[in-house]
Design a protein with these regions (language model features):
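Short alpha-helical functional segments enriched in proximate histidine and acidic residues
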Residues: 33-37, 55, 59, 107-110, ...
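Immediate post-signal peptide segment of exported/extracytoplasmic ligand-binding proteins
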Residues: 59-75
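Short glycine/serine-rich loop/turn segments
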Residues: 72-155
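An N-terminal boundary/leader segment
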Residues: 1-48, 53
Length: 155
């Protein structure tokens, strides 16, 4: 079986277009990987399994009907400072509580237009004021190559 987490985005797109993988298979692999490593890394603040799989199924149906898009069916996690309509927007802070964004940021609109699956929010420094996630209300993230180190700064 293909180790989805080790593929580049171009390789994922090639396998999707070639029918070697479905969006659902990729999404399931991503969710399984998150479940297996995020306890150590603390990279994700939140993600919605049901919504992610539903989006993957929609992408697979679209592809089966001949639709295409540059990112159709590719999972994308979003930094917790970018607005996604009807999803929590914390900016890695407890101060915003359960705030739900009433709109999509322009980058989210563009990703959706390209067919991307927006499925999770990733950790960062509170209000993007730092470079190590040590100041996140959700705890620090860890470097996936060596968990004794910070994963580094911002985008």
């Amino acid at each position: 079986m293909t180790m989805v987490h080790s593929l580049t985005i171009n390789q994922l797109i090639e396998k999707l277009r070639g029918g070697e993988l479905t969006s659902r298979q990729i999404m399931e692999a991503c969710l399984n990987r998150i479940d297996s490593v995020d306890g150590k890394l603390n990279a994700f603040i939140s993600y919605d399994v049901e919504d992610a799989l539903a989006q993957a199924d929609i992408a697979d149906k679209a592809r089966s009907e001949g639709q295409e898009g540059p990112l159709l069916g590719v999972p994308v996690a979003i930094k917790d400072v970018i607005a996604v309509r009807n999803h929590p927007l914390n900016c890695a802070s407890k101060i915003l509580g359960n705030y739900q964004s009433p709109y999509d940021a322009t980058v989210i609109k563009k990703l959706r237009e390209a067919g991307a699956i927006i499925f999770g929010r990733v950790n960062m420094d509170e209000f993007a004021m730092g470079s190590s996630t040590e100041n996140s209300a959700f705890g620090p993230s860890r470097n996936p190559w060596d968990i004794d180190y910070t994963p580094g700064g911002s985008s």
